[in-house]
């Protein structure tokens, strides 16, 4: 339990940041799911549009510190590879 006023304030700040970061992470997952659905449909155009949105959202999460830089880069790379595979087919 936080005893000092500074510690109590830190607990409040952490709670607020956790809420914001959870919302950001959820938003990233939503865009990733939309990309997955576009891939499953087999429509290259829709998949490309969904990829651009998912990439943008992932990189925004990286810049906000919600996702580590390397994790974001790895996810984008894998999404791009899957999009390329669909476009080639």
Curated annotation (Swiss-Prot):
Keyword terms, alphabetized: Ribonucleoprotein, Ribosomal protein, RNA-binding, rRNA-binding
GO CC terms of this entry: cytosol; small ribosomal subunit
Coiled-coil segments on the chain, per record: none
GO molecular function, one term: small ribosomal subunit rRNA binding
Biological process (GO), any one: translation
Transmembrane helix found in the keyword field: no
Pfam family for this entry, one: Ribosomal_S20p
Record flagged with keyword Transferase: no
Alphabetical list of InterPro entries matching this protein: Ribosomal_bS20, Ribosomal_bS20_sf
SUPFAM superfamilies, per the entry: Ribosomal protein S20 (SSF46992)
Free-text function comment from the UniProt entry: Binds directly to 16S ribosomal RNA.
Family in the record: Belongs to the bacterial ribosomal protein bS20 family.
Alphabetical list of HAMAP family matching this protein: Ribosomal_bS20 (MF_00500)
Protein name, entry field: Small ribosomal subunit protein bS20
Organism from which the protein derives: Phenylobacterium zucineum (strain HLK1)
Biological classification of the source: Bacteria, Pseudomonadati, Pseudomonadota, Alphaproteobacteria, Caulobacterales
């Amino acid at each position: 339990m936080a005893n000092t006023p500074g510690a109590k304030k830190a607990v409040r700040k952490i709670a607020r940041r956790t809420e914001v970061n959870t919302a950001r992470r959820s938003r990233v997952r939503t865009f990733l799911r939309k990309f997955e659905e576009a891939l499953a449909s087999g429509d290259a155009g829709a998949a490309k549009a969904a990829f651009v949105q998912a990439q943008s959202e992932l990189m925004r999460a990286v810049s906000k510190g919600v996702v580590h830089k390397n994790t974001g880069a790895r996810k984008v790379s894998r999404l791009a590879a899957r999009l390329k595979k669909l476009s080639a087919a």
